[in-house]
A protein has these predicted regions:
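Secondary-structure boundary/capping motif
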Residues: 33-34, 142
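Nucleotide and nucleotide-moiety/phosphate-recognizing core
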Residues: 15-25, 33, 40-97
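Helix-loop-strand module that forms the ligand-binding subsite of alpha/beta enzymes
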Residues: 78, 82-129
Length: 171
């Protein structure tokens, strides 16, 4: 019986990169209600509306485990929740360059995200990052659904992410 050695011929970069230069990444904890907006955004996304050669990833609360995915793309668009004191479902686009540029943490995944940015900067592998935040008013432990108001913001977030992708592609 012959061994299939092909499965062992991939490098880490090959495994985490599909050759696309833009990654759309949703992060959050879907077990915490509205805090899971980024994950819910990715899970409900109609990728057919987007140009070809875009990567999409449900990053969950991945933190450090997302480094190989992020470093293998030139531009990363992140969707996440924030409790920044703004009116609920305010959608904000940030372009953080340093970990201190990220909004206040909500849960453990943001701690990992900020540290991940520091690590990528240190390794000189920091892509251009765009961060869409959706303001939420509360987190509900062990609640799998988004509140109606936050769920209703997903089409607008999708439209804003699509517009940004098209602007990036046209430049």
């Amino acid at each position: 019986m012959e061994k299939n050695t092909e499965i062992f011929q991939y490098t880490t970069d090959d495994f985490h990169s599909d050759g696309n230069d833009i990654l759309v990444l949703g992060i959050g904890n879907y077990l915490m209600g509205d805090e899971g907006i980024g994950v819910q955004f990715i899970q409900n996304l109609d990728t057919a509306k987007f140009p070809q050669n875009i990567s999409f990833l449900d990053g969950g609360t991945g933190g450090f485990t997302l480094i190989p995915y992020i470093e293998s793309h030139q531009k990363v668009i992140i969707v996440d929740a924030t409790m920044d004191g703004k009116e609920e479902v305010t959608i904000t686009l940030l372009k953080p360059k340093f970990s201190d540029d990220f909004p206040i943490s909500l849960s453990g995944h943001n701690f990992g995200l900020k540290d991940m940015v520091d690590i990528l900067s240190f390794m000189n592998k920091m892509p251009e990052i765009y961060l869409f935040t959706v303001t939420i008013s509360k987190m509900e432990p062990m609640y799998l659904e988004l509140s109606p108001k936050v769920a209703a913001s997903i089409p607008k977030v999708t439209e804003m992410v699509l517009d940004l992708v098209q602007k990036i592609r046209n430049n």
